[in-house]
Amino acid sequence: MPKLGILKSKSMFCVIYRSSKRDQTYLYVEKKDDFSRVPEELMKGFGQPQLAMILPLDGRKKLVNADIEKVKQALTEQGYYLQLPPSPEDLLKQHLSVMGQKTDDTNK
């Protein structure tokens, strides 16, 4: 049967692992159980990776605690993305945003 000239685009997925050593620290990689592009020192500090989820990135506009464009770029360029815990200041801003308040309102 002749080819119809339709190209399937490769969907972008990431596999997210939780650190066994550091709370709220996550490692995103392109393929399940493939840490070949992750530096050895990073893996030592990360501990035993614990599978959190497999996530399609195509069609997604945002992630909860990471910039999706930075994640995609890091996966493409270096093969991994490391998500560190948010700082206390970031947590406050996020909470206030959810509550519909502005940071300036906290001083009233």
UniProtKB/Swiss-Prot annotation:
InterPro entries documented for this protein: YcgL-like_sf, YcgL_dom
Matching Gene3D superfamilies: YcgL domain (3.10.510.20)
Listed PANTHER family: PROTEIN YCGL
YcgL domain segment(s): 12-96
SUPFAM superfamilies: YcgL-like
HAMAP family: UPF0745
Pfam family, one: YcgL
Gene name, Swiss-Prot/TrEMBL: ycgL
Protein name per its UniProtKB record: Protein YcgL
